[in-house]
Amino acid sequence: MCIRDRAVAIGTAHGVYAEKPVLNLDCLASIAGACSTPLVLHGGSGLSDDDFRACVAGGISKINIFTHNNLTAARAAHTHFTESVGAFELMPFITEAVKHETMHHMRVFGSDGKA
């Protein structure tokens, strides 16, 4: 069996938070120093751009932001919804909103231009 990546528990989890998560960057540094496996941050909800940058600098290789993108899509649908507009007509607005946020996160994570 091969472990390809490792999700670390440093103060985040999946979903929306009632309060801003508190990152344990010392824990991240310890794990990153002891492990050669790429590290994953589960649950980026509530983190600032600076928090994400600190995580990447500390050794995080993959960040999950589904909840953020899901809420972005829902907001775009809500903004453009009318009684005469269906899901098909909403998709361009949703796609553009999620694309915009994804490109922003790629710049923050330092992954833009690398695919």
Give a label for each model feature.
Residues 78-115:
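Extended, intrinsically disordered, low-complexity segments
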Residues 13-25, 62, 79-94:
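Glycine-rich tight-turn/loop motif centered on a GG-T
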Residues 44-58:
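Catalytic cores of alpha/beta
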Residues 1-3:
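Short, small-residue-biased leader/transition segments that mark boundaries at the very start
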Residues 10-14, 59-76:
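Glycine-rich phosphate-binding active-site loops on the catalytic face of alpha/beta enzymes
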Residues 20-41:
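Alpha-helix-loop-beta-strand connector modules within alpha/beta enzyme cores
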Residues 6-8, 39-43, 61-65:
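Hydrophobic faces of well-ordered beta-strands that scaffold small-molecule active sites
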